[in-house]
Amino acid sequence: MAKQSMKAREVVRVKLANKYRAKREELKAIISGVNSSDEDRWDAVLKLQSLPRDSSPSRQRNRCNQTGRPHGFLRKFGLSRIKVRETAMRGEIPGLKKASW
């Protein structure tokens, strides 16, 4: 189990990323825009740098919904590999069965 503070930190990062998503996209469009002047680009870069670090989506970490484990995360299920195996063995994931060949 991950510490509660680590799970809470991820929740804050998700909220910040959602809050600043539109502003971030707008500034990045100005920076990468062909028609933008150098001065506008530089202003956009400075504004982008002044946004909170945790508002960047790349700072988010996928975590298991049940345990908060950051490694071995399977996106399809939203769980770590360990919890996927446990729930699959109990038959709680519809359509998933153990492979045998």
UniProtKB/Swiss-Prot annotation:
UniProtKB keywords: Ribonucleoprotein, Ribosomal protein, RNA-binding, rRNA-binding
GO cellular component: cytoplasm; small ribosomal subunit
Keyword rRNA-binding carried by entry: yes
Gene3D superfamilies recorded: 1.10.287.1480
Region (Disordered): 49-70
Family: Belongs to the universal ribosomal protein uS14 family.
Described function: Binds 16S rRNA, required for the assembly of 30S particles and may also be responsible for determining the conformation of the 16S rRNA at the A site.
Subunit structure: Part of the 30S ribosomal subunit. Contacts proteins S3 and S10.
Protein name: Small ribosomal subunit protein uS14
Organism per entry: Yersinia pestis
